[in-house]
């Protein structure tokens, strides 16, 4: 009999969506909270297959001691872009995402959110939108 704890199951789900965001590693909010000496970027608020409760997911960017000024500035701009996105402030989110892309043109995350902004402009999510991205596959 194979027993898979909730933590192992979540880890497996996160591994499955990591490549969709174009990042090397994703961790849960709990892991990011417990890790010391690492700078994390919040990536998204997701509901993975088999879980009812959405979770925030993070990407480790650098050791705190090695994070340079550009990384920290980009992180701050990303946090502002994510806040604007979640507040359905599409123009501001787009402006900030384009600013991020100017510095890091190959970061897929920015393209993903620019596409979401474009999609939500055409088909707004509504006032009760919680910002959660649902993943139905493993």
Predicted segment positions?
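Short, small-residue-biased leader/transition segments that mark boundaries at the very start
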Residues: 1-2
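Intrinsically disordered, low-complexity, charge-biased linker/tail regions
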Residues: 126-138
């Amino acid at each position: 009999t194979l027993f898979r704890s909730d933590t192992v199951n979540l880890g497996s789900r996160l591994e499955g969506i990591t490549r969709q965001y174009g990042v090397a590693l994703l961790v849960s909010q709990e892991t990011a909270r417990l890790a010391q000496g690492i700078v994390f970027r919040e990536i998204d608020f997701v509901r993975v297959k088999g879980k009812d409760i959405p979770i925030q997911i993070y990407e480790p960017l650098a050791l705190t001691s090695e994070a340079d000024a550009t990384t920290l500035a980009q992180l701050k701009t990303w946090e502002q872009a994510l806040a604007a996105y979640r507040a359905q402030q599409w123009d501001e989110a787009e402006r900030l995402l384009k600013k991020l892309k100017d510095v890091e043109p190959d970061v897929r995350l920015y393209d993903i959110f620019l596409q979401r902004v474009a999609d939500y402009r055409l088909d707004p999510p509504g006032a009760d939108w919680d910002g959660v991205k649902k993943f139905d596959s493993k």
